[in-house]
Structure formats: C-alpha cells, structure tokens
Amino acid sequence: MSKIIAINAGSSSLKFQLFEMPSEKVLTKGLVERIGIADSVFTISVNGEKNTEVTDIPDHAVAVKMLLHKLTEFGIIKDLNEIDGIGHRVVHGGEKFSDSVLLTDETIREIEEISELAPLHNPANIVGIKAFKEVLPNVPAVAVFDTAFHQTMPEQSYLYSLPYEYYEKYGIRKYGFHGTSHKYVTQRAAELLGRPLEDLRLISCHLGNGASIAAVEGGKSIDTSMGFTPLAGVAMGTRSGNIDPALIPYIMEKTDQTADEVLNTLNKKSGLLGVSGFSSDLRDIVEASKEGNERAETALEVFASRIHKYIGSYAARMSGVDAIIFTAGIGENSVEVRERVLRGLEFMGVYWDPALNNVRGEEAFISYPHSPVKVMIIPTDEEVMIARDVVRLAQ
C-alpha cells in the first residue's frame, strides 16, 4: 500500500487529493483558495465532512506546509514519511513531453523553458512543484501534462496551414488540452463496453467551463478541438472558441482596444457569457432559456451546435464511431446540452433514449441497446490518472 498525493496548483489556488494505492481509495481531498490574497480559505474533507479555515496564506510554500500539517493533525497520516509520491498536474508539456515524467532539477528546468506556451498556467504549476520539493525533498514527484495525450496526433491534425518555419522556429502548432481527462474516460469507456481500447473509435466530449472534443482511435488521440492554446475549438463559458483571425485587427480598430485587450475579451468575455450577455454558467442560461430569454436560447444553440459539428467531423475522420462520451461538469450533468448535441445524429447510427438521458453525474449508457453507436456519460477523474502515473513512474 502506498499513499500518493495529486496536486493541481493554480496561480492563487491549490487542489489536492490523497490516494491509497493501488486500491485508488480517496483518503482526503481539499482546496486552498486565495493564496497570496487576504482571507485565504483552506478546505479539507475528513470522513466526508468539510473543514474550512480562513487565514492568511501568503504563498504556495505556506499552503503546502499547512496542507501537510492538516494531514497529520486530522490523523489522515501519522507522519510525512507515509507520503510515497506526489503527482503534479502541469498544463503544457510542449513537444518535449509526450508522457508524464519523473521530476528532477533538469525536467523542472525544461518545463520552465516551455512556460511561454502557457503563461497563465505553467508558472503556477511550477510554483506548486517547487513548494513541495522544498518541504518533501526526498519524496519522488511526477509531472502529468494536459497536452501529453495529444502528442500522438498526426502532422495533418496538428499543423496549422501557416509558413512551415513558424512551426520549426516558434513551435506554433496545435497541442490540445484536457488530455488526462480524455485519456481516463476513453480507457474507462473500453472497460464499460467490454472491448479492447485498440479496436475502438471514440469521441470524447469534455464539457466544462473550458470544453474540448477529442477523436480517439485505438486508444490514441488523432485530433482535438483546442489548439495552440485552450482558446480554440468550441464556444465555452467565457472563451470564444474558433473565430476568423481577421476579426482581431478589425475589433482593435473599431473598439480602440490593444491586441492584448482583444485577447482578454476572447478569453474572458466571450462564449456563453458574450452571447447571453449575463452569465458564463450554463445552469443560469438553461433556466433563462426556459423562461423565454432569446439570447440565452441562442447561447445554448451556439454552444451545442459547435460540439455537434465536431462530432460529425471526427466521425468522418475515423470512418465511423463506436461511442460518444460526455464528461466534465456540463457533460456529466446537463441533460439539456446532451439532448441538443445528440439531436439529428440518427443518420450516423446514434439512437438515444430521453429517459436514460435524464441522469446527472453518474456513469450511464444513454443510448438504446440496439444503437450502433453507444452514448455514454463517464464522470472524469483526472486525479486518479495522476496517482496512477506516480505509481507507474516513481515506484
């Protein structure tokens, strides 16, 4: 039995989950919020009960020390020697990392070198890595990359039709994200279908505030909707998804915004929020749509129709599909979005049952037994994938 902690460090937050392996039993999980901001919040679940403390946590190193202290204080572990490995989520692995990697001074330096590819995420991930290294220097640590799963994409999928030297000199290409989630749900789908992953053509729809679709053939990602950054692809909570690139100088000219300001609009003021005009939360938009709000209805249709189009194109790309998977906050819980996405896919062998679709947050088949293409809901578990990779690489 080993104890593995999975970490997801954001710029002002730290999510954690402690596993007993190989049983994959969750011993505790929690979240530190508002790190470096007044009134930081530390939340930990003990025996299913949430314990919350509001205090000042000036940086990630203090957050890590507090977390480890709480694990012993609540008797979850006797002492720090019980922690056998640490797994860190890292958003961007560039082309360098096509798999998770054991963290050494050299690999940490290499992750720092590709941070310009994910300036909003990687620096925070590295802060988390260094904070744990300081407190637990002798415990093996592993980085698990969001991009790694998509490194199997062929050139025709990842290259942009730009001057080739941009790819050679600057690494400009599609990388894709949510890889750990897409990998988990496609592996789980094969188990639930009782078929070898190598034989399956799967379309995975990770729909949360950020959303991406992946075409997975024989267990390998062959295409995905996000691109060089997580801004590309389908419309999202606050992100635009794909737009005509010529719009950027046009918007700059019309609104007197700088390029950075337009980019901020595309990242934080677009998507469901931009179209609806009032919320990035899908639940609010579904409610407003039911009450007759036309912009809310349009936002829902824009969101669903973009996903619908990716499913069609990826089915064509793989010459068919065996199963469509819905996962993440919206994919697992929104009956309405699944219904809108699936509507009209009967031509490709998708027959789903509205009664079976009336389910939230649990594993389920929502297609009829006779449907040639299965439709599944699989709650994602990125943390358990991180823990598995720590066991695989560190022990």
Swiss-Prot record:
The record marks 178, 239 as: Transition state stabilizer. Mg(2+). Can also accept Mn(2+). It comes from the Bacteria. The active site is at 146 (proton donor/acceptor). It is an enzyme of class 2 (transferase). GO terms for biological process: acetate metabolic process; acetyl-CoA biosynthetic process. It is found in: Cytoplasm. It catalyses: acetate + ATP = acetyl phosphate + ADP. ATP binds at residues 15, 206-210, 281-283, 329-333. Coiled coil: none annotated. The keyword Cytoplasm applies. InterPro entries: Ac/propionate_kinase (IPR004372), Aliphatic_acid_kin_short-chain (IPR000890), Aliphatic_acid_kinase_CS (IPR023865), ATPase_NBD (IPR043129). One of its GO terms (cellular component) is cytoplasm. Its main location: cytoplasm. Substrate binds at residue 89. Homodimer. Catalyzes the formation of acetyl phosphate from acetate and ATP. Can also catalyze the reverse reaction. This is Acetate kinase. The lineage of its organism: Bacteria, Bacillati, Bacillota, Bacilli, Bacillales.
